[in-house]
């Protein structure tokens, strides 16, 4: 049996409109909260190389900076370019005070000979420590060396995994599940 709009009780129509508005509000909250969560932090471990062609076989990139004041700004403003062909590693040189405050950070592409002197060296005259580390792999020099445990010559191959598209598909499906019963 079909009802004319005048045959429906007003409270049923208002309840139906309220349910639709509530469903739309829930979907919008989910969408906005998920977008905010993704944009909240910069994760330097998740950096993936671009899909542009490499200049030569086994090309790689390192975070690069010269005398930066802190690690965050070094990584954030690092120049995005391929390392020269005569280099194989990423070198990090970290100068810091006896209280652990960074005074200078240098990161660059390096040859094997530049990586022979890894470790930490304390200068009694200036009360500063210099720690040097080298690593092998695409953008492997995220962290700073701060002691003999991490001021090493490490061979670390970055994992190349493709990102999942699940969050993209999840939201439209969720929206459809909420809205479909209300129609």
Swiss-Prot record:
Disulfide bonds join 62-90, 65-74, 83-109, 115-134, 120-131, 135-140. Residues 165-183 form a propeptide. It is a lipid-anchor; GPI-anchor. Likely acts as a modulator of nicotinic acetylcholine receptors (nAChRs) activity. In vitro acts on nAChRs in a subtype- and stoichiometry-dependent manner. However, according to another report in vitro it can weakly inhibits alpha-7 nAChRs. Residues 60-154 are annotated as: Sufficient for inhibiting alpha-7 nAChR currents. This is Ly6/PLAUR domain-containing protein 6B. InterPro entries: LYPD6-like, Snake_toxin-like_sf. It is found in: Cell membrane. It comes from Homo sapiens. The keyword Endoplasmic reticulum does not apply. CDD domains: TFP_LU_ECD_LYPD6B. Residues 1-39 form the signal peptide. Residues 60-151 form the UPAR/Ly6 domain. GO terms for molecular function: acetylcholine receptor regulator activity. Its main location: membrane. The keyword Acyltransferase does not apply. A lipid is attached at residue 164 (GPI-anchor amidated serine). Keywords: Cell membrane, Disulfide bond, Glycoprotein, GPI-anchor, Lipoprotein, Membrane, Signal. GO terms for cellular component: extracellular region; plasma membrane; side of membrane. The gene is LYPD6B.
């Amino acid at each position: 049996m079909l009802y004319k709009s005048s045959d429906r009780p007003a409270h049923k129509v208002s309840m139906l409109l309220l349910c639709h508005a509530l469903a739309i509000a829930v979907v919008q909250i989910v969408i906005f909260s998920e977008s905010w969560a993704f944009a909240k932090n910069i994760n330097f471990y998740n950096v993936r190389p671009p899909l542009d062609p490499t200049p030569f076989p086994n090309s790689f990139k390192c975070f690069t900076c010269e005398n930066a004041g802190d690690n965050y700004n070094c990584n954030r403003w690092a120049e995005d370019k391929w390392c020269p062909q005569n280099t194989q590693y990423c070198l990090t040189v970290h100068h810091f005070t006896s209280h652990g405050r960074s005074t200078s950070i240098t990161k660059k592409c390096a040859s094997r000979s530049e990586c022979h002197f890894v470790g930490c060296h304390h200068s009694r005259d200036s009360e500063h420590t210099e720690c040097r580390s080298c690593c092998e792999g695409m953008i492997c020099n995220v962290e700073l060396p701060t002691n003999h445990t991490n001021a090493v010559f490490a061979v670390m191959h970055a994992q190349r995994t493709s990102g999942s598209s699940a969050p993209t598909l999840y939201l439209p499906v969720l929206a459809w599940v909420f809205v479909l019963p209300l129609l």
